[in-house]
Swiss-Prot record:
Disruption phenotype: Deletion mutants display increased resistance to oxidative stress and increased catalase activity. Residues 163-182 bind DNA. Transmembrane segments: none annotated. Belongs to the IprA family. This is Inhibitor of hydrogen peroxide resistance. Involved in oxidative stress resistance. The keyword Protease does not apply. It holds the Pfam family HTH_46. The gene is iprA. Keywords: Stress response. One of its GO terms (biological process) is response to oxidative stress.
Length: 207
């Protein structure tokens, strides 16, 4: 079974090779588009620092993650027809280079194994949202999202509002999300502070 743990060792090898040829960038504001597949489909983007959100068509939120992250690693071989965007959630730095050059460098430096690990992990993450949400009722979707959020480190959780994240990820109405969160807090199942998730004590399987 593929691990959902980010393959940092493999990222390090790829970054060491690619960074020498990349054009640096820095974003200092939130909600700036770093990568858009309909504009940047011939480039590979490597995020070195910062928090980013990954969104699909119609601004559907797939998830939020901290650097490091690579987008467009395989675009030099096959174009991605699904429109994705990477959005900065604060200060963000990294670099980009032509996707075809990325493939050439991977070939020259025999980094196919590392590239495969990264792409396998990325595909698993992209699938995870659909696995957690499709075919489940509103509470089950909220529950799954809370469980995914508690796996974030404390710094990331302190930056992301629970209600907005759940609403954008699931498309469940804010009123329903607020009602469920209030009930879970009242029952002592979750702990929140200023709208941020602090802890999960236990989540009932049904609401």
């Amino acid at each position: 079974m593929l691990s959902v743990v980010k393959p940092l060792q493999e990222f390090g090898k790829l970054d060491k090779c690619l960074s020498r040829y990349g054009t640096r960038f820095e974003f200092n504001n939130e909600k700036q588009v770093i990568f858009s597949s309909d504009v940047n489909n011939e480039d590979t983007f490597v995020i070195l620092e910062g928090v980013i959100s990954l969104r699909r068509e119609e601004n559907v939120l797939i998830g939020i993650t901290q650097a490091p992250y690579i987008m467009g690693l395989a675009d030099g071989l096959m174009k991605n027809d699904i429109p994705y965007k990477l959005i900065s959630e604060g200060n963000c730095t990294g670099y980009h280079l032509p996707a075809k050059q990325t493939i050439t460098l991977i070939e020259q430096n025999q980094l196919w194994r590392d590239a495969f690990y990264w792409l396998a992990w990325q595909n698993r993450i992209l699938e995870l949202r659909d696995v957690q949400l499709i075919g489940h009722n509103s509470y089950e979707q909220i529950r799954a999202t809370l469980l995914s959020m508690i796996d974030w480190n404390e710094e990331l959780r302190s930056r992301i509002g629970v209600m907005n994240y759940i609403h954008q990820r699931t498309r469940i109405s804010r009123s329903v999300v607020a009602e469920v969160l209030a009930a879970l807090r009242k029952g002592g199942y979750i702990e929140m502070n200023k709208g941020k998730l602090v802890a999960i004590n236990r989540l009932p399987s049904e609401y």
